[in-house]
Amino acid sequence: MAHKKGQGSTQNNRDSAGRRLGVKKYGGEVVRAGNIIIRQRGTRVHLGQNVGMGKDHTIYSLIDGVVKFEQKDKNRKKVSVYAAS
């Protein structure tokens, strides 16, 4: 028989790394075409003008310009990029 009792191991003591989501370029910032503006899960922020959406719902700029966050309706936000004039 064992002289010492075997050490138990814990099963639930793991965590995944953070996904680095969120706003990458804020309102008023100058962006180039292709710059990522927001990384998100689902469409927390919707598309405005001159922005595109990747398959993981990442919003990116289609033109060089300035980022502007706007209200789409009562409880939805959108982000647009307008050419710097």
From Swiss-Prot:
One of its GO terms (cellular component) is cytosolic large ribosomal subunit. Keywords: Ribonucleoprotein, Ribosomal protein. GO terms for biological process: translation. InterPro entries: Ribosomal_bL27, Ribosomal_bL27_CS. GO terms for molecular function: structural constituent of ribosome. Gene3D superfamilies: 2.40.50.100. It comes from the Bacteria. The keyword NADP does not apply. Residues 1-23 are annotated as: Disordered. Pfam families: Ribosomal_L27. SUPFAM superfamilies: Ribosomal L27 protein-like. HAMAP family: Ribosomal_bL27 (MF_00539). Belongs to the bacterial ribosomal protein bL27 family. NCBIfam families: L27. This is Large ribosomal subunit protein bL27. It comes from Aliarcobacter butzleri (strain RM4018).
